[in-house]
UniProtKB/Swiss-Prot annotation:
Name recorded for this polypeptide: tRNA 5-methylaminomethyl-2-thiouridine biosynthesis bifunctional protein MnmC
Molecular function GO terms recorded: flavin adenine dinucleotide binding; oxidoreductase activity, acting on the CH-NH group of donors; tRNA (5-methylaminomethyl-2-thiouridylate)(34)-methyltransferase activity
Species this protein is from: Burkholderia orbicola (strain AU 1054)
GO cellular component entries: cytoplasm
EC code(s) of this entry: 2.1.1.61, 1.5.-.-
Function as written in the Swiss-Prot or TrEMBL entry: Catalyzes the last two steps in the biosynthesis of 5-methylaminomethyl-2-thiouridine (mnm(5)s(2)U) at the wobble position (U34) in tRNA. Catalyzes the FAD-dependent demodification of cmnm(5)s(2)U34 to nm(5)s(2)U34, followed by the transfer of a methyl group from S-adenosyl-L-methionine to nm(5)s(2)U34, to form mnm(5)s(2)U34.
UniProt keywords, alphabetically: Cytoplasm, FAD, Flavoprotein, Methyltransferase, Multifunctional enzyme, Oxidoreductase, S-adenosyl-L-methionine, Transferase, tRNA processing
Length: 643
C-alpha cells in the first residue's frame, strides 16, 4: 500500500505569529526567514561565486518548507551578472503546503516586493499534492525547481543528480540522510546546515565531508580521502558541439526536439513521411489520463509523473504562444464491472488523492456528470481529457524555432559512427545528417536501426471510428472504459479503438467499426441512437508499438556487442554497469500512452545528455531503460559467454 502524502498545515497564534506544526514559527520581515536562508545556505555554500560562468549548477535542498532557501538562491542567481546559464534546485519535502497555505506562509515571511513576481510564479506553478517528482521551470527555463514530495530519506536514496551544493536541513540532517547525500555529491560539492550535533559531524566525516563551524552553522566540502562509491553521479555527455539527430517526428520525437532546443541544441529532425505526426500521432484525438492502482506500482508512478509533467509542459507551450487543441473539462474512467469498480475504490482509498487529481464517482454521480445512463461509477480526472496529437507535435516543433531543421520524406537506412560522430545514411550510403547524438523516436524501426537483439516490439493495429455530428447524444467530456468516446470540436464523436496485435493491415474494415460501436454502446448505453451501417462510417487506422512489459524504452542504448563479450562479468550488472553506445538514445515503445510519456521521456533524455538532475527516480528510470531486457538476459546467463 502506498504511503499517503500528508500536507503541512498553518495556524495563527494569539500574537499574530503564523506557525506550522511541521516547520515551527514563520518569521516576518526582510531580516527574518529569507535573510537567514541567504546567510546560512547561499553564503554558507560560497555562492554566488561558485556557480559563476558555469553552464549548470545544482543545489539539493533537503527541506523545501515555505521555499525560503529556494527563493534566496533564485534572487542571488538573478542578481549575479556572472551567473550560471541554468540553475537547478532539487528540493525534498515530506509535507508540502497546499497552494493557499504556501501563499499565506510566503506572504508572511517575505516583505520584499521586488520578488513578488517570483512568488507569484512559484504559486502559479505549484503542483498537485501527490507523491513523486514535480519539475517546475522559471525565468524561461533557466531556473529549474524539482520538487520531490514524500519521505525525505527514501527520496534522497532514489534521486539521480550530481549536486554542487547542499542546503542541509530537516530529517536529512542525520546519518542516513547524509549517507544518501554523499552518493549525490559532485567533486568539491559543499554543504551548509544549522545542525551541529555530534551524530551529524560523525556522519559527515565518515562519508567524506570535511566541516568547520562558522558562527551558528556548519559548513564544509565533499573531499573523500578514498573512493567509496561504486557508481559516480551522472555527468554531461562530452560533445564538441550541441548537435543532435532525432529520427521520427511523432509525439516522442517532437517532444525531444523541443526539450533539446530549449537547452541550446541544434537538431536535425528526420521523418520518412511528408509531414510530422503522420502515423499514430496523426489521429484526430488521443485520451490522456493517469493510472491508479492499489499498490501504486511502477506503471502507476511512471504514468502519474508523465501525466503531471506533460500538463506542465503543455501549459508552458501555450503561454509561449504555441497553443493546440485539447479538452479542458476532465475525463471519466468508467468501471467495466462491479468488480472493476471495487478495484478502483480500493486504489482510490489506498492512495487518497486530492480532488484536483482524482475523484471517485458512484454510478449515480457518474450518471449525473455525463447526463447519460451508465452501469458503473468510475474515476473522474479533472485534468485528464483528450488532446489533438498532431497539433501538439506542431506546437513543439514551432517552439524549437530556428534550432530545428526538418528532413521530411526521408528514410534512414542505417547509422554509422565515425570517430565521435554519428552519421545517418540513406540506402545508397550517402550521409543525410551527422551529429554526436542520435535519438531514435521512430517506433517499430528503432530496434533495427540500433541493432538491438534483446528488445522485442510488437505492432498493434488500432482502428478508430468517427460518428458524424448530430448522430449521438451530447457528451460533456471524454469517457473511457472498455473503449473510449471523445467529443471533437466540430461535433463529431470519436470512438474506439480496436486492439489487434501483430495485425499490420492498413485497410479500413467495417468489422472494426462494428466492434467500436458495440464496445461504446456497452460503455455508454444512451450515447448512440440508431446504429449506423458500419460500412458507411469514416475512421482511421494506425499502429502502436508495444513492449512485452508495457513500459516504454527511454534513455541511452546499450552496446550489446561489448556486453556480450563481457557477459560473464556482467552477470550481476545493474543498469549503471552496462556499456552504452556513446551518444545513442531511444524514445520508443510508447504503445497507446504516447501523450502521457512523451514529454517526461524527452525531459529525461535531455537531462541525461546535459548531466542535469533527472526528472524521475532511479527506480523508474531503470524501469524504462532500453537495456532492461539485456540486463535480465545477462542475469539469467542467456547471453554470449555467460551461456
Amino acid at each position: 500500500m502506498p504511503d499517503r502524502l500528508v500536507s503541512a498545515t498553518l495556524a495563527l497564534r494569539d500574537d499574530g505569529t503564523l506557525v506550522s506544526p511541521e516547520f515551527g514559527e514563520l518569521h516576518r520581515g526582510a531580516s527574518g526567514t529569507l535573510a537567514r536562508a541567504h546567510r546560512t545556505f547561499v553564503a554558507g555554500n560560497g555562492l554566488p561565486a561558485r556557480w559563476q560562468r558555469r553552464r549548470t549548477f545544482t543545489i539539493v535542498t533537503t527541506a523545501f518548507g515555505a521555499g525560503a532557501g529556494f527563493l534566496a538562491a533564485w534572487v542571488a542567481w538573478r542578481d549575479d551578472p556572472a551567473r550560471c546559464e541554468r540553475l537547478h534546485v532539487v528540493a525534498v519535502e515530506p509535507h508540502p503546503f497546499s497552494r493557499d497555505d504556501l501563499h499565506r506562509a510566503v506572504s508572511h515571511m517575505v516583505v520584499d516586493t521586488t520578488i513578488s513576481a517570483d512568488v507569484d510564479a512559484l504559486l502559479d506553478a505549484w503542483p498537485i499534492l501527490v507523491p513523486g517528482l514535480h519539475r517546475l521551470e522559471f525565468d524561461e527555463g533557466r531556473v529549474v525547481l524539482t520538487l520531490a514530495f514524500g519521505d525525505t530519506i527514501d527520496l534522497l536514496k532514489k534521486l539521480v543528480a550530481r549536486a554542487d551544493a547542499f542546503f542541509l536541513d530537516g530529517a536529512a540532517a542525520s546519518g542516513d540522510g547524509i549517507r544518501a547525500l554523499a552518493k549525490l555529491a559532485g567533486e568539491h560539492a559543499t554543504f551548509a546546515t544549522h545542525a551541529k550535533s555530534d551524530d551529524v559531524k560523525h556522519a559527515l566525516g565518515e562519508t567524506g565531508f570535511t566541516f568547520r563551524e562558522v558562527d551558528d552553522r556548519l559548513v564544509g566540502d565533499y573531499a573523500p580521502r578514498w573512493r567509496a562509491r561504486r557508481h559516480e553521479p551522472p555527468r554531461a555527455l562530452p560533445v564538441a558541439a550541441r548537435r543532435a539527430i532525432v529520427i521520427g517526428a511523432g509525439l516522442a520525437g517532437c517532444a525531444v526536439v523541443e526539450r533539446l532546443a530549449a537547452r541550446g541544441w541544434d537538431v536535425t529532425l528526420i521523418e520518412r513521411h511528408e509531414r510530422i505526426a503522420s502515423e499514430a500521432s496523426g489521429n484526430p484525438a488521443g485520451v490522456f489520463h493517469p493510472l491508479m492502482t492499489r499498490d501504486d506500482n511502477v506503471a502507476s508512478r511512471l504514468t502519474r509523473g508523465g501525466f503531471l509533467h506533460a500538463l506542465a509542459r503543455w501549459r508552458a507551450l501555450e503561454r509561449a504562444g504555441h497553443a493546440f487543441s485539447r479538452s479542458t473539462h476532465g475525463m471519466l474512467h468508467l468501471a467495466e464491472s462491479a468488480d472493476d469498480f471495487a478495484r478502483m475504490r480500493d486504489a482510490f482509498d489506498a492512495f487518497g488523492p486530492p480532488s484536483d487529481y482524482a475523484t471517485l464517482l458512484d454510478a449515480d454521480a457518474a450518471r449525473a456528470h455525463l447526463n447519460l445512463p451508465v452501469a458503473q461509477g468510475g474515476l473522474l480526472f479533472p485534468h485528464g481529457g483528450a488532446v489533438w496529437p498532431a497539433g501538439l507535435c506542431v506546437a513543439q516543433y514551432a517552439a524549437a524555432g530556428e534550432r530545428v531543421r526538418l528532413l521530411a520524406s526521408t528514410c534512414v537506412a542505417r547509422l554509422e559512427r565515425r570517430d565521435d560522430t554519428w552519421h545517418a545514411l540513406d540506402d545508397t550510403g550517402a550521409t543525410l545528417a551527422d551529429a554526436p547524438v542520435v535519438v531514435l523516436a521512430n517506433a517499430g524501426d528503432a530496434a533495427r536501426l540500433a541493432g538491438l537483439r534483446h528488445v522485442t516490439l510488437q505492432p498493434v493495429r488500432g482502428q478508430l471510428t468517427l460518428l458524424p455530428p448530430g448522430t449521438t447524444a451530447p457528451l460533456p467530456c471524454p469517457a473511457i472504459g472498455d473503449g473510449y468516446a471523445v467529443p471533437l470540436d466540430d461535433g463529431t464523436l470519436l470512438i474506439g479503438a480496436t486492439f489487434e496485435p501483430d495485425d499490420t493491415d492498413p485497410a479500413m474494415r467495417a468489422a472494426g467499426h462494428a466492434e467500436n460501436l458495440d464496445r461504446v454502446r456497452h460503455l455508454l448505453p444512451g450515447l448512440i441512437g440508431a446504429l449506423p451501417d458500419p460500412a458507411t462510417l469514416r475512421g482511421r487506422v494506425a499502429f502502436r508499438w508495444v513492449v512485452g512489459d508495457r513500459l516504454p524504452l527511454i534513455g541511452p542504448l546499450a552496446d550489446e556487442t561489448q556486453a556480450t563479450a563481457n557477459a560473464r562479468a556482467l552477470g550481476g550488472a545493474q543498469a549503471r554497469d552496462l556499456p552504452r553506445m556513446p551518444g545513442l538514445y531511444g524514445a520508443f515503445g510508447f504503445g497507446s500512452r504516447g501523450l502521457v510519456w512523451a514529454a517526461l521521456g524527452a525531459e529525461l533524455i535531455a537531462s541525461q545528455l546535459e548531466g542535469e538532475p533527472w526528472p524521475l527516480e532511479r527506480e523508474l528510470a531503470d524501469a524504462v531503460d532500453p537495456a532492461r531486457f539485456l540486463i535480465r538476459a545477462l542475469r539469467a546467463r542467456r547471453v554470449g559467454s555467460a551461456g
